[in-house]
Amino acid sequence: MAVSLPLFQFILFLLLLLLSRTVYAYLIGVGSYDITGPAADVNMMGYANSDQIASGIHFRLRARAFIVAEPQGNRVVFVNLDACMASQIVTIKVLERLKARYGELYTEKNVAISGIHTHAGPGGYLQYVTYIVTSLGFVRQSFDVVVNGIEQSIVQAHESLRPGSAFVNKGDLLDAGVNRSPSSYLNNPAAERSKYKYDVDKEMTLVKFVDSQLGPTGSFNWFATHGTSMSRTNSLISGDNKGAAARFMEDWFENGQKNSVSSRNIPRRVSTIVSDFSRNRDRLLDIAATYKSSRGHSVDKSLDVKTRVRNGSKRKFVSAFCQSNCGDVSPNTLGTFCIDTGLPCDFNHSTCNGQNELCYGRGPGYPDEFESTRIIGEKQFKMAVELFNKATEKLQGKIGYQHAYLDFSNLDVTVPKAGGGSETVKTCPAAMGFGFAAGTTDGPGAFDFKQGDDQGNVFWRLVRNVLRTPGPEQVQCQKPKPILLDTGEMKEPYDWAPSILPIQILRIGQLVILSVPGEFTTMAGRRLRDAIKSFLISSDPKEFSNNMHVVIAGLTNTYSQYIATFEEYEVQRYEGASTLYGRHTLTAYIQEFKKLATALVNGLTLPRGPQPPDLLDKQISLLSPVVVDSTPLGVKFGDVKADVPPKSTFRRGQQVNATFWSGCPRNDLMTEGSFAVVETLREGGKWAPVYDDDDFSLKFKWSRPAKLSSESQATIEWRVPESAVAGVYRIRHYGASKSLFGSISSFSGSSSAFVVV
């Protein structure tokens, strides 16, 4: 029977419609926004070192987000922060803003906010006392920039939602992390350890996002290694190895994926905009000699944004390197050594002649922490590029999510009994052990504490009791942890530690993300992943199979320190001593995640659970504000204090320095802008920005001549990259000064020109 042409066209239309829905079943959007924050005076979050005060920028911090949505159904949001961890109060305020914008579209259920665990970002943005002691309390600038950056990254992702596909790939990266507590890991059952080749997880899982018309738009990956390539004495804001990897990959993609990824040629996307000058050195020097340093002068506040290299108006490729179960994983891969003798540290306690302060891990670039950051970042970047280029497994299936708040200070947990059967035990109010104060080999503590201490000592117990003496029930519950700080029961001036924690599952087809509010150790993460994967497969083998990918997103939605296995907890190294809720903490997580998984499989709605507190109105800040900025008589803000040498020539790999009279960076955070720019002279006599303070090759360093001085200076260091084009360059500084009456004025100044050959 003949088919009429209109009917044939209608059938063809339906087939094409079905095909398009099959090929591009998701809407996908990505976004990215600056969260660098105050680059001066603020204590850095991570090492709890009160002397580690920000004084410049290594490269900028960002919030990177993706949204994956069913066209007429569920959607999930994942935000990766170049920050030490997520914060409960940040999450609360972000969700409030999203509700004001979008109603119930984005809520605590389907939004995950995760930190990469850099130890080189401004602190003071968490709400619990324990985590803001060294930052002199709450720092409003740190908090505001993170909240705003997360919101803006999600807004960008929402506004860029378009039909697309997501692909997943995974592979092993072997040399970017080592176990920093191997004696603790060895306390896990031998039969369990025998299932794994390594004592840390080596697998990176990457998701590649592809727009149906525009092509690749981003990638997010999860891999476990600590953000501690930068040391506890570093004072420059840095995304550490994961932030560096993200910068490298975004530049690699924006540069057309053509640049080599060798260690000598970190990808740059901007060199192609510079005209290739003659290689005649004398001619270039003659040109450079005509451009002397400029006097400091007032500029429009937005000029630093307009002249930055990575223009915010352009569609971005967003690449995020997310954290996983990194609890006992160090990027300092050369091992741990005593700084006085050079000998390896004690295996069980990580001490040197009984002192923890002398035992440090060495990164692959030792003794250069910036080089270690580059190497570990580059390793992750190269692995991600390989997975990105070979990603062919398409994510297909439902979008789903589950979320619950739980009171971990008093949770009933069912555990097996030694003689068979089971019994119900409880988690404990939060407490930290003596081993916590010893620190780790990435950042040792002080005094006479040591890891692996399950006894404590009389003197420090007396000191502890001044704050709070733990009761007998708490002591029994936390055993064998000797309690140093009973933080869960300390409530003055407000809560010292969290009790109510969020747990969350996000599903994108065969990818399942377990959002956890802390740092799982390697084996703890393996147990959780394996338990939930097995549970999902057994619950619905048609919907879930062995081909599913389960990843842990660490430090997500809030922060509650560490989660060690029962056996690791017994050893009481740093990770066990920092497992707040007692020896059954991991079992509690597995139990409660199974409840989320049950709800995910059956499409159930779980009770919301007890609400975490909003302590914003109770916060105390002791950080003094900027009072006034000044310069010596006859000097303007932005004037050059120390210029580049006259008629100077630099080769690739050499460093160029210029120092300017400046104001405090807290006056203007230069969000989505830059304090420092390297400009090149283009044909026609126009200067074009080619590097800024978001580049790995450039460092912005700020200092005062004395602690209470109102004068300050900014030194900009540029190590000429291998990819730099020969030509005439200069260094420009942007800043802001505060008058005695409180007004803020923006300024700029530039160095004399110099030649790169």
UniProtKB/Swiss-Prot annotation:
It catalyses: an N-acylsphing-4-enine + H2O = sphing-4-enine + a fatty acid. One of its GO terms (biological process) is ceramide catabolic process. Keywords: Endoplasmic reticulum, Glycoprotein, Golgi apparatus, Hydrolase, Lipid metabolism, Secreted, Signal, Sphingolipid metabolism. It comes from the Eukaryota. Residues 1-25 form the signal peptide. GO terms for cellular component: endoplasmic reticulum; extracellular region; Golgi apparatus; membrane; plasmodesma. Pfam families: Ceramidase_alk, Ceramidse_alk_C. InterPro entries: Ceramidase_alk (IPR006823), NCDase_C_sf (IPR038445), NEUT/ALK_ceramidase_C (IPR031331), NEUT/ALK_ceramidase_N (IPR031329). The keyword Hydrolase applies. Glycans are attached at residues 311, 348, 657. Hydrolyzes the sphingolipid ceramide into sphingosine and free fatty acid. This is Neutral ceramidase 2. It comes from Arabidopsis thaliana.
